[in-house]
Every structure is written in C-alpha cells, then in structure tokens.
Amino acid sequence: YTGVDLGTACVVIAVLDENKRPVAGAYRYADVVRDGMVVDYIGAVQIVRELKEQIEEQLDTELIYAAGAIPPGTDLLDSGAVKNVIQGAGFECTNLLDESTAANQVLQMKNGAVVDIGGGTTGISILKDGEVVYIADEPTGGTHFSLVIAGAYGKSFQEAEVFKRDESHH
C-alpha cells in the first residue's frame, strides 16, 4: 500500500506491507499547498516524483498504485488537483481519503478520535463501532503554533519553524 499526503508543511509518501505495517517512507518540507489547496502544481508533481523514485530505489521495486490523503471537507474543492499530482508523478491513483480516515485505515480504531495536526489545519475524525461518524477540519495547525513560538520567544517566523522542529525542544 502506498499513500501520498500533500500537506501544507510537508509532502509525504508512506509505503505499507500487506499487513499494513510501515516498510518505507520519505518526506520533504515544501510550500506547494496552502490551506488544503495545491498552489504549486508543477512543484508538487516534481516532489512526489522524486520521493517516489527515492523509495523505489530503497525498496528495489516499482511503486505503481497510490492513494491520496486530503484535508477533511475539501474533497469537492481540491481533490481533483491532488489526484492529478499523484498521477503526474507516475502513480495510478486508487483512492482519495480524508487524512484522519486514511490514518485510521492503518490504526483500525473502533471507537475514538483520530487527530491529524497538519501545517495549516487540524483534521479530526470521530469513530464509533469502526465507522466515521464525524469529520472536521479546524483552521489551526503547525503554522499557527510557529506564530505563537515566534511571538513568545521574539523570533522570526522562520526561526520559530526551525526551533519547533528541533527535537531538543520537545
């Protein structure tokens, strides 16, 4: 199984085996998506293609199929662009799922919540008896967290981004 997530902060590809266990993954910080919308189509295709090639070399196999993850509630708004990016990078797009629901395909929770804190938004899925009963996309994410760090510590936004990603500050 291969999944592609075009995020506000990162573009990610994850590969799972037949038992849905992670076997490979790659990511790159990128500014190709803003507020769930692809704003740099060519850049997004290039990054996904490069990550795909990196993983194919690592696994010594060709990745043919991929599903895409999109922010909750944006399927009518931008899912076509996400699908086109995936296809433009050389995959056959098999499915598009909201990010939290896609995560639960791996987690397989029966009851609870999946919270996906992204760069620009936070996706939330509530599950009951294994079914998604509520989906929301809140307009707060890592970018907002960086703004808080910048203000609290008197840093530039870029310095706050670097500070936030440094594991010694966790």
Regions found by a protein language model. Give the residues of each.
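A structural feature that tracks compact, well-ordered secondary-structure segments
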Residues: G123-S125
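Nucleotide/phosphate-binding catalytic cleft detector across ATP-hydrolyzing
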Residues: Y1-T8, V12-I117, D129-H170
